[in-house]
């Protein structure tokens, strides 16, 4: 299990809150978060409560100025622990929402669905095993989304409207 400590001010100053699991609304514990330390594990922070909106992946390390790092002053309101001891990874991706278009199956990282599968987009997926990060651009760049086992029928319904995913990576021991 991971451990993260949030601080109200930059450079690890002000009130702090220690977290070791998911938190759907961090404003319950503190009014703002300007810096944090990830002591172990990996975490995904979300810009809105209940794990909605833009996401940012944090691994072990120190983040002394969260607003600068996350760009445009984005604040976050919820956090989810991402470290899970999976050995098997399997996901099906679809070109269109609701099982539409071309389908491809992944068991490992994919730095470009266009190059590997000749797919122009990924709008739906079914994660059967493991935990994954999906990226807006090829080569693991741009906005990202954290996926656990389950069906993701429409990214638009998850607050990710207009997002196109072009690469995906397994969450392994990289934390």
Swiss-Prot record:
Domain of life where this protein originates: Eukaryota
Classification via InterPro entries: Beta/Gamma-Crystallin (IPR050252), Beta/gamma_crystallin (IPR001064), G_crystallin-like (IPR011024)
Pfam (any one): Crystall
GO molecular function: structural constituent of eye lens
Coiled coil: none
Subunit comment: Monomer.
Protein known as: Gamma-crystallin M1
Native source species: Chiloscyllium indicum (Slender bamboo shark)
């Amino acid at each position: 299990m991971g451990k993260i400590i949030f601080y109200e001010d930059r450079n690890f100053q002000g009130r702090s809150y220690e977290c070791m699991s998911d938190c759907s609304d961090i404003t319950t514990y503190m009014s703002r978060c300007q810096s944090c330390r990830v002591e172990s594990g990996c975490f995904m922070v979300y810009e809105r409560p209940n794990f909605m909106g833009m996401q940012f992946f944090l691994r072990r390390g120190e983040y002394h100025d969260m607003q600068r790092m996350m760009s445009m002053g984005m604040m976050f309101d919820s956090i989810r622990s991402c470290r899970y001891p999976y050995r098997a990874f399997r996901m099906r991706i679809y070109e269109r929402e609701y099982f539409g278009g071309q389908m491809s199956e992944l068991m490992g990282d994919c730095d470009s669905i266009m190059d590997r599968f000749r797919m122009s987009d990924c709008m739906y997926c079914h994660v059967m095993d493991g935990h994954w990060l999906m990226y807006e651009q090829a080569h693991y760049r741009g906005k990202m989304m954290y996926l656990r086992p389950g069906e993701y029928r429409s990214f638009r319904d998850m607050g990710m409207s207009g997002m196109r995913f072009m690469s995906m990576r397994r969450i392994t021991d990289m934390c």
